[in-house]
Amino acid sequence: MTRPLLSLAIGLLLASSTAIADDMPTFRLLMKDGRFFPETIEVPAGTRFRLEVKNEGPGATEFESLELKKELVLAPGVTRSLVFFPMKPGSYKFFDDFHPETGQGRINAR
């Protein structure tokens, strides 16, 4: 009897966490030819959000932010997502370590 109840509880927990994640605002970032499009992303401060990152370039790229402690390497043609916890108002830098001269951007939380 305990095992079926535990399985049910785990199933409900997973279903509710998926529903919560689907309600999260999603912002899109395109990486191509060593650049970010857009270079600046405006997000609401104090709100958890998802950043969907897509590499449309011919080589590997990297989304990295030391301030936000996030790093993501993408092969050509790959799309991946990062979830950010609520941010304080401010401006947070990100960059592409493989293209340091051109791959610069910023997330503005307002």
Predicted regions mapped to residue ranges:
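Bacterial N-terminal signal peptides that target proteins for export
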Residues: 1-7
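Bacterial N-terminal signal peptides
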Residues: 7-16
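Beta-strand cores of secreted/periplasmic/IMS beta-sandwich domains, seen most often
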Residues: 39-59, 79-87, 93, 109
